[in-house]
Structures are given as C-alpha cells and as structure tokens.
Amino acid sequence: MYCERFICILRILGTTLFGVSLLLGITAAYIVGYQFIQTDNYYFSFGLYGAILASHLIIQSLFAYLEHRKMKRSLETPIKLNKTVALCIAAYQEDPDYLRKCLLSVKRLTYPGIKVVMVIDGNSEDDVYMMDIFTEIMGRDKSATYIWSNNFHDKGPGETEESHRESMQHVSQLVLSNKSVCIMQKWGGKREVMYTAFKALGEAWNYVQVCDSDTMLDPASSVEMVKVLEEDPMVGGVGGDVQILNKYDSWISFLSSVRYWMAFNIERACQSYFGCVQCISGPLGMYRNSLLHEFVEDWYNQEFMGSQCSFGDDRHLTNRVLSLGYATKYTARSKCLTETPIEYLRWLNQQTRWSKSYFREWLYNAMWFHKHHLWMTYEAVITGFFPFFLIATVIQLFYRGKIWNILLFLLTVQLVGLIKSSFASFLRGNIVMVFMSLYSVLYMSSLLPAKMFAIATINKAGWGTSGRKTIVVNFIGLIPVSIWFTILLGRVIFTIYKESKKPFSESKTTVLVIGTILYACYWVLLLTLYLVLITKCGRRKKEQHYDMVLDV
C-alpha cells in the first residue's frame, strides 16, 4: 500500500517536472530564436523552434504509421461475438433524411443481438417526427416507444417524488425488456440524453456504444471496436474513424473532411499507440459498461468555475476513463460517416465550442498524466501551448517585420501545409489530401482567434451548434475573427504604405515579385483542382450510396 502510494507520488513529480521542463525548453528556444540556417536579409531562416515542431510532426507520423500496422495485423485476430452490446443514439431536432440513414445503418450492423436505445432531447409535438421515423425503420412490432414528461433529473409539472421514481423505473424496465427502444424526454441537453440511456441500461450489458443521430455506421463498426476491447482488459474505451457524410456540399465541409482524416488517422492513431486517445468522438465510440457506472454520476454533475458543464460530453467521458488508469484506443477498422456544418458561421461556432471543452478538459486531463505514458504529457504541452506561440509569431512578424517578412510567413504557412498534406496523401493513398494545405489558412484566419475567444468565454454555456432540422445562425463567432483581421490587415496596409516611400533594392524587389507570383500560382492551382474535383464528385454524389465504401 505504502509502496504503491510512494510510486504514485514519484510518477506525479516526474510527469510534472517533465511537462514544466518541456514547456520552459520550448519557450526558451522560441525566445532565443537560435537559427540553424539563414540567408542575407533574413529572406529564409530555419531555427531551433522550427526544428522542434518539425521533429514533433515526424515522430507523431511515425507512431501513427506503427499503430496502423498493428491495426492491420488485428484483422486476423479471431473474436467470439458472445459479449452483449447496447447502442445509445442521442437525437436532437435531427434532419429527417440524416436520421433515416442513421437508423438504416444501425439495422445493417453485423454484431449479433445488439440492443438499440434512441433518446430524443425534447418531448414536444415538434419532436414526434423522430419517434415516428424510429418506429418506421426499426419496425412498429419490434420496437417500444415512450413519451416521458420529464427526465431522470427533472420532474414533470405537478409530479410527486413517488410518481417520478415510478416513471424512472418504467423507463428502465422498457429498455431492459425490448431490443429497440425510443424515448422522448424533457429537454436537458446531450448529457441528459446520454445519462438516460446509461442509467436505463444499467449494468446488464458488457459494452455500450455511443452514436449521434446524424451518423451512418459501417456494418462492421461494432465488431471492430469490440475486438479492441476484447484484446486488452485494460482498454476502457475505443473510438473509430469518423468521416464526413456531406463533404461535397460546401468548401467548409470539404476542408473539414481532409482535416478529420488527419485528426483521426495521424493524431489519434499516434495517441492510440500509447493508449491515451484524449477524445473518443460522439459519432463512434464504445466503452466498458462496468467503467461507465463507476463515474456516470460524476460525469453528469461535472462543474467548472462553479457552473455545471453543458458541452464537451464526449471528451469528458474519455477523460473519466483515463482518470481510472485505463487506456483509450483508436481503430481505423471501425468507420462511420457524420454530418458537419456547411455554413462558415455554424462551423465557427462549433469549433469555438469544441475549443472551450478542449481547454477545460486539458486542465482536468493534467491531473492524470502520471497514470499514463509520458507521451500524454508531451503531446498535451505541445498542442496546448502551440496556438499561443503561433499568435506571438504572427503579431511579431506583422508588427516588427518588413513586407517581405509577412510574405515569407504566408509562403511558409503554405509550404508547411503542403509538406504535411503530401505526407498525408502518401499515407492515405489519395491525392485529395493535398487540399489539407488550404486548411492551414482556415486555421490561421479563423481557428486561432476562435481559440482565444473560447478561452475568454470558457465559462459561457450558450450558442453551440443548433439542431439540423432548423439551422440557427449566430453571428457572435465573427467578433474574434473580425478583431483578428483588423489587427493584421491594418498593420499590413501601414507597412506597405511606410515601405512604399523608400525605393526597394533590386534583391528585395526580386524576392517580393517571385514570392507574390508563387503564392498566387499556388492558390490558382489548388482552387482550380478543387473546382474540378467538386464538379466531378458533385455529379457522382447524387447517385452515391453509403452502404460499405466510406473512404471515398
């Protein structure tokens, strides 16, 4: 007992020292600005800080590659399909077409005897259409439905404690005695919906799979996640490869699709190698039910800065598994398609909400670094503080640099993005990943200010993404982007005005002309390729079926 406590203290001290030393080292490298290579007039330079980031990308890609090799070997692993699995679907004002596709994909799941529980967040007449779709797809004679005037935490109007307790027991009994169940309940948010499913299922099931109502599951998705949990009893949760269903609907959904591939197949695959995936996504995840019931109450009642948390449910669910010392994994063998915003403003609000939960959960996650591999500490420091270093770099270049420094920065952003996207194209075997280099511009122009705004408003619970049946546009996300553009564009105009009064030397003029031409040609080429791809795939999309082939 004392020995275990002593080892725990040593691990806490060790990971804390490692994390602090890493942050101080990176900060020192950034401040000192030591350059390995630099040309006259600083037209090009490569320093220590850049080398650290480049090394991180190489190491991350290497471990992701090794994890994918392990996944391929697991194809031959025999599995007994004798464990019980329950699928929980969270629904809120869903687009009828997406909901139908979701439920049809659920019916095609190959795992035997899977129980399906769909909980609808809302019990008004406007929500009944989702229950009707459920009974239509799952079969009226094979499914049970219940319209609940309350939920597990809120009583209905005029309801007593005893009647509330009886209604909870009725919901639990309904779920346990039927293979397919749909429950409409009083609105309370996604966490309330998930809580209802978890509590109603009880501890009778081995594994619980989670899914959103806009998600289309691959038939083998459940089998592949069960396989990961069966291979190692110390794996508490596993997520799959989430791809974009509506990626050809707009430029924002298309760029999101290539970003998703990088996030899952490079970043999370690398985390999976060390058993510390930091977010099992809501569209496709599976947990050991025994673990869920150890922390479901604490998960539901999570508070931050004195307020109950109303977003970041999936990330906190993952963190709760990690807090118990269990590993979290990712498997590319389990796949799904899900909807993503096609409007810029809705996407921006979604990213701001996700950034809020990321920074909040970063603090919670830090308490459990000592229970996992050092990679968890290392990556948390690198990814957590990278936006701050990047903002400092941008402001420094725009306010202290010359016009060619600004141009060089723009070229460097695209060059780094092109190198990453080329490597991703090699790993995926699909040239479409080259468009990932365009996402870097979206990151610099929109995600950076959104992340800072997320930190400034981290305790505000409102304005997440709306339901898909009725899209609500919220303009508040434009505030940080507008401020960011004003700061940078104003300085660019001032720098051009100031330097135009002095004649450029021949070498500077040459650099500016060549750089501008290269930058313009790069954009013309990629935008042309994008238009060709969208025209070609847009025609195919009308006849496209999403039964089996997900990676298209």
Swiss-Prot record:
Report the EC code(s) recorded for this entry.
2.4.1.212
Highest taxon of the lineage: Eukaryota
Q: Which residues cross the membrane?
A: 12-32, 46-66, 375-395, 403-423, 430-450, 476-496, 511-531
Q: Which UniProt keywords apply?
A: Cell membrane, Endoplasmic reticulum, Glycosyltransferase, Golgi apparatus, Lysosome, Membrane, Transferase, Transmembrane, Transmembrane helix
GO terms for biological process?
A: atrioventricular canal development; endocardial cushion to mesenchymal transition; extracellular matrix assembly; hyaluronan biosynthetic process; polysaccharide biosynthetic process; positive regulation of urine volume; renal water absorption; vasculogenesis
Q: Which cofactors, by name?
A: Mg(2+)
> Extracellular side of the membrane: what ranges?
33-45, 396-402, 451-475, 532-552
Q: Which residues lie on this side of the membrane: Cytoplasmic?
A: 1-11, 67-374, 424-429, 497-510
Subcellular location per UniProt equals:
Cell membrane; Endoplasmic reticulum membrane; Vesicle; Golgi apparatus membrane
Matching InterPro entries = Nucleotide-diphossugar_trans
Spell out the GO cellular component terms annotated for this protein, sorted alphabetically and separated by semicolons.
Answer: endoplasmic reticulum membrane; extracellular vesicle; Golgi apparatus; Golgi membrane; lysosome; plasma membrane
The Gene Ontology terms for molecular function here are: hyaluronan synthase activity
Kindly give the membrane topology term recorded for this protein: Multi-pass membrane protein
Q: How does it assemble?
A: Homodimer; dimerization promotes enzymatic activity.
Report the protein's function. Catalyzes the addition of GlcNAc or GlcUA monosaccharides to the nascent hyaluronan polymer. Therefore, it is essential to hyaluronan synthesis a major component of most extracellular matrices that has a structural role in tissues architectures and regulates cell adhesion, migration and differentiation. This is one of three isoenzymes responsible for cellular hyaluronan synthesis and it is particularly responsible for the synthesis of high molecular mass hyaluronan.
- Family statement drawn from the similarity comment of this UniProt entry: Belongs to the NodC/HAS family.
What's the name of the protein?
A: Hyaluronan synthase 2
Q: Which gene encodes it?
A: HAS2
